């Protein structure tokens, strides 16, 4: 990476991000603007992918809401995310869990590991 770009982005990186991987269940506290008010909206689900590096690193969280799968993609170092909580660690053998989109109910469960 260009040293100039690297020096500019180092100040933007957040240090309060917990370690999480695909398969982990996380609770994301996202700031949402509604009119003139700003509030925290909690989005809890399974991390199905994590891609990119540095300031442009992103992760995708999937949850089932009302029987419908909902996915949201967040940048890791965005100020729009207040905090990320890791609820449980899942045991998976893939980096991208896109196959969970086709599974329903008990088939979509991920085994928990103790860390």
From Swiss-Prot:
GO molecular function, one term: structural constituent of ribosome
Domain of life: Bacteria
Ribonucleoprotein recorded as keyword: yes
SUPFAM superfamilies: Translation proteins SH3-like domain
InterPro entries named among the record's database cross-references: Ribosomal_bL19, Ribosomal_bL19_CS, Ribosomal_bL19_sf, Translation_prot_SH3-like_sf
Gene3D superfamilies in the record: 2.30.30.790
GO cellular component, one term: cytosolic large ribosomal subunit
Any single GO BP term: translation
Keyword Transcription: no
Keyword vocabulary terms for this entry: Ribonucleoprotein, Ribosomal protein
Protein family membership: Belongs to the bacterial ribosomal protein bL19 family.
Biological role stated in the UniProt entry: This protein is located at the 30S-50S ribosomal subunit interface and may play a role in the structure and function of the aminoacyl-tRNA binding site.
Protein name: Large ribosomal subunit protein bL19
Native organism taxonomy: Bacteria, Bacillati, Bacillota, Bacilli, Lactobacillales
């Amino acid at each position: 990476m260009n040293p100039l770009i690297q020096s500019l982005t180092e100040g933007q990186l957040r240090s309060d991000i917990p370690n999480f991987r695909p398969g982990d269940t996380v609770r994301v506290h996202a700031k949402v603007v509604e009119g003139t008010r700003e509030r925290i909206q909690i989005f809890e689900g399974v991390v199905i992918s994590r891609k990119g590096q540095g300031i442009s690193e992103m992760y995708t969280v999937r949850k089932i809401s009302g029987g419908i799968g909902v996915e949201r993609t967040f940048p890791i170092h965005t100020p729009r995310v207040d905090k990320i909580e890791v609820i449980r660690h899942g045991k998976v053998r893939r980096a991208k869990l896109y196959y969970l989109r086709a599974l329903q109910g008990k088939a979509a469960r991920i085994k928990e590991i103790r860390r």
